[in-house]
């Protein structure tokens, strides 16, 4: 309900108008939620209200929508009708999409292994106006986000590299994508020794890089445009030789969330039938400890010939991504976008509320941050000035993997990855500092947020490859 409409308008438009009018007088210009029981409903229904100031940001809309969903979930609602009053058509449509996104995210089941568990009874969602086509973007985005959260929630003994590969192949068949898995033997032929170094201590030989391809039927250009998505898929990260302490290791089954977000983005964009081709490259491995584990001070040659001085085995994500980015770039895509839960430094800089963005094209910065505001998945762009490279100068190799002191590691990690993307290809790197947040984020009620899918869908609504 808009909190800036006249009492006369409120009385005319809204059900239970006298109670609503009293609420509005009490609230003034505040934004708040309220619940009124509908005694006329024999099934014990409820009217759930939120008073919204005009001009609320998308993030604020999603937050408020999540509050309404929580009340509905507590009522064990089987049917929900979503409606807005007092807004113009543009604001009303945006609010309805926020409400729908919150209901879908809140009611979506995630993996559970409890012997007894309850499920949400929601069966029907009704919308006051519009057709399914008006909400196609929200539905496709939810499908991608739910997939990302589902995969990231799975225990590491369930989603190991082999099972992940099988799941991806099944999904590719379902969605009519092409699928190719580069095994360790194939990667050896590609001289992808940075990736292979991380995989050396794995108990099984099931690591590799999955390549999924969506071929747009509406891409009629002679020069077809292609987006390359890249995701970090470390199915479990012990830290390697530089072993993590327990507190830092306990949730490291989620270190593959970058790959899940890249996959969810592929799912959302392909279901929206975007007019460009997509290649999705997922780096799937574990980072284990053992006699074959890679060690500090090794010098490793990546697939593009760049030599790397290893400093810390727990900086494995940038090693696996180095070769994956190199392979993705060989097909000369129009843009490379990678997602990774890469650095604690980015969390330190932004907390878990936002994610960090980096690009080799400064002119993309405004569009990157605009997509964050429009989608409610907020990102902040960090500097990519070339003088940061001096911190990664190595006495024995082309580049150091990282520094010992960790200062600005989110920026240095991006500068490291930049060495594996040709200057001719635009590239965006998202460091997923908001991949997990206690209590959820915006409309997502779970700690694992699947952050990035909504942002990417909005970014490619506005981005032109021309």
Segments and roles (model prediction):
Residues 28, 162-466:
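A generic structural signal for tightly packed, nonpolar segments enriched in small/aliphatic residues
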């Amino acid at each position: 309900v808009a909190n800036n409409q006249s009492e006369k308008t409120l009385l005319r438009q809204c059900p239970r108008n006298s109670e609503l009018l009293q609420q509005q007088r009490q609230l003034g210009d505040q934004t708040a939620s309220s619940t009124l029981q509908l005694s006329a409903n024999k099934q014990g229904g409820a009217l759930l209200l939120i008073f919204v100031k005009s001009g609320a940001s998308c993030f604020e809309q999603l937050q408020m929508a999540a509050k309404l969903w929580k009340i509905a979930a507590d009522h064990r609602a089987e049917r929900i009708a979503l409606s807005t009053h007092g807004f113009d058509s543009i604001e009303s449509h945006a609010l309805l999409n926020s409400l729908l996104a919150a209901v879908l995210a809140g009611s979506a089941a995630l993996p559970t292994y409890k012997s007894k568990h309850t499920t949400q009874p929601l069966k029907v969602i009704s919308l006051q106006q519009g057709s399914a086509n008006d909400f196609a973007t929200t539905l496709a985005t939810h499908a991608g986000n739910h997939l990302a959260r589902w995969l990231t929630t799975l225990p590491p003994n369930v989603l190991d590299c082999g099972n992940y590969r099988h799941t991806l192949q099944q999904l590719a068949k379902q969605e009519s994508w092409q699928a190719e898995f580069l095994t360790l033997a194939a990667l050896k032929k590609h001289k992808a020794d940075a990736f292979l170094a991380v995989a050396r201590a794995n108990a099984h030989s099931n690591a590799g890089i999955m390549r999924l391809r969506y071929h747009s039927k509406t891409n009629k250009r002679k020069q077809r445009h292609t987006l390359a998505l890249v995701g970090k898929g470390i199915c479990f990260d012990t830290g390697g030789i530089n072993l993590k302490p327990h507190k830092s290791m306990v949730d490291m089954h989620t270190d593959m969330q970058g790959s899940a977000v890249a996959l969810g983005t592929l799912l959302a964009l392909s279901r929206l039938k975007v007019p460009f081709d997509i290649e999705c490259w997922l780096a799937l491995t574990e980072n284990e400890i053992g006699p074959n584990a890679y060690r500090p001070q090794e010098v490793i040659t990546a697939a593009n010939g760049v030599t790397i001085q290893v400093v810390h085995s727990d900086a494995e994500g940038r090693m696996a991504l180095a070769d994956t980015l190199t392979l993705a770039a060989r097909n000369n895509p129009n843009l490379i976008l990678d997602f990774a839960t890469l650095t604690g430094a980015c969390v330190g800089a932004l907390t878990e509320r936002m994610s960090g963005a980096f690009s080799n094209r400064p002119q993309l910065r405004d569009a990157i941050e605009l997509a964050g505001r429009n989608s409610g998945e907020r990102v902040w762009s960090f500097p990519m000035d070339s003088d940061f490279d001096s911190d990664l100068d190595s006495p024995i190799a082309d580049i150091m993997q990282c520094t010992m002191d960790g200062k600005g590691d989110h920026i240095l990690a991006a500068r490291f990855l930049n060495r594996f993307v040709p200057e001719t290809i635009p590239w965006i790197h998202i460091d997923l500092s908001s991949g997990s947040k206690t209590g959820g984020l915006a409309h997502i009620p779970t700690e694992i947020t699947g952050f990035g899918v909504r942002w990417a869908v909005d970014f490619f609504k506005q981005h032109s490859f021309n």
